[in-house]
């Protein structure tokens, strides 16, 4: 089946423009993307005209509450939209469709962004499209890297899933049974009072590079799924013994050297990433694929990419794909891109069907724009 992506091209135009708004967590992103007519390919790539982002950052040891995050988004959304349009050198009347994150995510921040999206759609009298946050990550990753039909490892603050495409759905082959990997890293960063700027997970990554002693932690893989709450509880307990009132010194049995905070970050990363590599490799075998695409904020972690690369090298013609922080970390351009793909196949939302949802499964989305 060949999908017609130009059925809804406006008369006299040879391209499409979409504005995307992302605000499912603490990052507010607005992006403008351009698709030329015809199917996207290696010779007809989507063009990123602007990709502006602002992050709500809290003090060390604190997370971000939905109410405060939503206030940040409301305060900044108009300025970010204006900046995105100015960077793209276009006006509102040039936009074909408004795209917004419909879920999953934090309720209050999502609601702040959808209000802005509805306002723009009515102000400029153009269609509006709700986008699944995960599908946005996948489609942007595929477009930027050129990955054809990879197994997708989606790792972020709110999601951890192993995904593969089949029959116009992104099927979930494995996922976390409790907390997401980004949540696990962020919460441990709060335990250690690690700064939240530019991001707690990034700061843990930098500390882990200085670690060299592996502290034993639970390793919880259950078939294709994994659990991280027990690992977090275990390493939190160790950290509180070391840096709390007890000031207990832990010694590495092999070297006789003291365990440091850097060693804890190193141990947490190595354990979590080993679990992710295991279930991803199992999915590759199941669908007979040799490509892995890593998306989501944690996907920019260099150690995760390195470990995945070591695994994929053992497979014939194995390839790993990942983007940099511009596209791995939550952004508006991925929402614009996925939303524009929906728009080009005639999928739009009526205003009364733009309600956000905190629970929005990846496999709920009908991927109409891909050939079956």
From Swiss-Prot:
Signal sequence residues:
none
Q: Name one Pfam family in it.
A: TsaD
- EC id: 2.3.1.234
Q: How is the cofactor bound?
A: Binds 1 divalent metal cation per subunit.
UniProt subcellular location: Cytoplasm; Nucleus
Name the job this protein performs: Component of the EKC/KEOPS complex that is required for the formation of a threonylcarbamoyl group on adenosine at position 37 (t(6)A37) in tRNAs that read codons beginning with adenine. The complex is probably involved in the transfer of the threonylcarbamoyl moiety of threonylcarbamoyl-AMP (TC-AMP) to the N6 group of A37. KAE1 likely plays a direct catalytic role in this reaction, but requires other protein(s) of the complex to fulfill this activity. The EKC/KEOPS complex also promotes both telomere uncapping and telomere elongation.
* Protein family (similarity comment): Belongs to the KAE1 / TsaD family.
Q: What is this protein called?
A: tRNA N6-adenosine threonylcarbamoyltransferase
This protein's species is: Candida albicans (strain SC5314 / ATCC MYA-2876) (Yeast)
- Upper lineage: Eukaryota, Fungi, Dikarya, Ascomycota, Saccharomycotina
Gene symbol? KAE1
């Amino acid at each position: 089946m060949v999908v017609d992506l130009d059925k809804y091209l406006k008369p006299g135009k040879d391209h499409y423009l979409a504005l995307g708004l992302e605000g499912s967590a603490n990052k507010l992103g607005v992006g403008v993307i351009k698709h030329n007519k015809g199917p996207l390919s290696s010779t007809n790539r989507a063009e990123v005209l602007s990709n502006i982002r602002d992050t709500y950052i809290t003090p060390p040891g604190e997370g971000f509450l939905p109410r405060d995050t939503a206030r940040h988004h409301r305060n900044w959304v108009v300025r970010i939209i204006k900046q995105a349009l100015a960077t793209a050198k276009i006006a509102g009347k040039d936009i074909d469709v408004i795209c917004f994150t419909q879920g999953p995510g934090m309720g209050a921040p999502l609601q702040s962004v959808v209000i802005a999206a509805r306002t723009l759609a009515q102000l400029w009298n153009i269609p509006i499209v709700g986008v699944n946050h995960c599908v946005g990550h996948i489609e942007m990753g595929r477009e930027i890297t050129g990955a054809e039909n990879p197994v997708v490892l989606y790792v972020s603050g709110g999601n951890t899933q192993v995904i593969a495409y089949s029959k116009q759905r992104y099927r979930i082959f494995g996922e976390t049974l409790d907390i997401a990997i980004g949540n696990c890293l962020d919460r441990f960063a709060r335990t250690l009072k690690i700064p939240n700027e530019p991001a707690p997970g990034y700061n843990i990554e930098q500390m882990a590079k200085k670690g060299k002693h592996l502290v034993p932690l639970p390793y919880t893989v259950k078939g294709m799924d994994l659990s991280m709450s027990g690992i977090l509880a275990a390493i939190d307990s160790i950290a509180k013994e070391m840096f709390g009132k007890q000031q207990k010194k832990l010694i590495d049995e092999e070297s006789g050297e003291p365990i440091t905070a850097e060693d804890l970050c190193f141990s947490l990363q190595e354990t979590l990433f080993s679990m992710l590599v295991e279930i991803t490799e199992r999915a590759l075998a199941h669908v007979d694929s040799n490509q892995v695409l890593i998306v989501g904020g944690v996907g920019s972690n260099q150690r995760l990419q390195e470990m995945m690369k070591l695994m994929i090298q053992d497979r014939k013609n194995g390839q790993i794909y990942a983007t940099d922080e511009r596209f791995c970390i939550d952004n508006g351009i991925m929402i614009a891109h996925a939303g524009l793909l929906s728009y080009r196949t005639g999928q739009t939302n009526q205003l009364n069907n733009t309600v956000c949802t905190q629970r929005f499964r990846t496999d709920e989305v009908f991927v109409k724009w891909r050939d079956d």
